[in-house]
């Protein structure tokens, strides 16, 4: 069995009981480990993650989760970690500590004879999307694109890693907390097949001849299972922050499931 999950936002200051939340995710992974050959973590597993040049005591809060990843990879389960827009800044320590494989960009894979497109989902929009939006929306999208470029800039990443972790983490965790609180105050539900960015992106890929049987994303914190055509399908995984939804794939079927809390 192959599993896909995303958006746990471990360590979020917007979570009332972060240790209990972490334990739920651990229970979820251990349940999957009973029959898993691979687990794909599709981004934003951490609410904020950065590997500095200095020792960072804040990583100790994740020790139970990191130990679980190590135990699973030691058993021969392949665990793939896709960076999201909250946990971009991993530079080798996480992979070395746990045995996972880190992916920094979308991947196109063939699994069980099916062609898959896997990504967190941030920054994926159709080529003409910006021009079609009202000016107010264009402004917000441009701000997001600018911020994403800043976060992915190698020079700025290097400089940020030079900061003392206590100072940098305060900024990072507060920024991430504000993002979560905004989502709670003003949730963004499914926009519809003709407006949802990831749906439009997947449709454009199909139109361009870049066919995939499944497109699997996180990022949006919505649960979606939609047929794009007779032989192409998109799934948005929900999240492991509030919903604890995931997808599982066997030889015959891919479906979204709920973890029983």
Question: Which functions belong to the PLM regions below?
Answer:
Residues 1-3:
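Extreme N-terminal starter segment of soluble prokaryotic enzymes
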Residues 5, 10-111:
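Core catalytic region of metal-dependent phosphoesterases/phosphodiesterases
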Residues 9, 109, 125, 241, ...:
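Residue-level detector of flexible, active-site-proximal loop/helix-junction positions
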Residues 47-73, 171, 180-212:
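N-terminal short leaders/motifs
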Residues 97, 101-104, 117, 122, ...:
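Conserved beta-sheet core of the metallophosphoesterase superfamily
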Residues 121-200:
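Active-site-proximal loop/helix segment associated with metal-binding centers of metalloenzymes
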Residues 251-261:
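Arg/Gly-rich low-complexity intrinsically disordered repeat tracts
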């Amino acid at each position: 069995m192959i599993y896909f999950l995303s958006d746990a936002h471990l360590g979020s200051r917007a979570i009332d009981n972060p240790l209990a939340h972490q334990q739920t995710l651990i229970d979820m992974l251990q349940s999957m480990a009973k029959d898993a050959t691979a687990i794909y973590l599709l981004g934003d597993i951490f609410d904020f993650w950065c590997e500095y040049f200095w020792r960072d005591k804040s990583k100790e809060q994740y020790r139970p989760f990191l130990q679980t990843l190590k135990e699973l990879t030691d058993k021969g389960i392949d665990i793939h970690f896709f960076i999201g827009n909250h946990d971009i800044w991993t530079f080798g320590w996480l992979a070395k500590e746990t045995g996972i494989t880190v992916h920094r960009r979308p991947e196109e894979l063939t699994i069980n004879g099916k062609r898959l497109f896997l990504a967190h989902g941030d920054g994926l929009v159709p080529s003409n999307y910006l021009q079609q939006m009202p000016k107010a929306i264009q402004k917000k999208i441009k701000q997001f694109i600018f911020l994403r470029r800043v976060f992915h800039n190698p020079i700025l990443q290097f400089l940020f890693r030079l900061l003392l972790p206590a100072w940098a983490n305060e900024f990072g965790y507060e920024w991430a907390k504000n993002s979560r609180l905004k989502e709670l105050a003003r949730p963004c539900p499914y926009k519809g097949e003709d407006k949802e960015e990831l749906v439009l992106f997947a449709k454009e890929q199909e139109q361009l001849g870049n066919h995939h049987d499944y497109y699997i994303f996180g990022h949006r914190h919505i649960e979606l299972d939609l047929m794009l055509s007779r032989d192409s399908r998109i799934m948005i995984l929900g999240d492991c922050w509030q919903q604890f939804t995931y997808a599982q794939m066997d030889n015959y079927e891919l479906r979204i499931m709920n973890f029983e809390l």
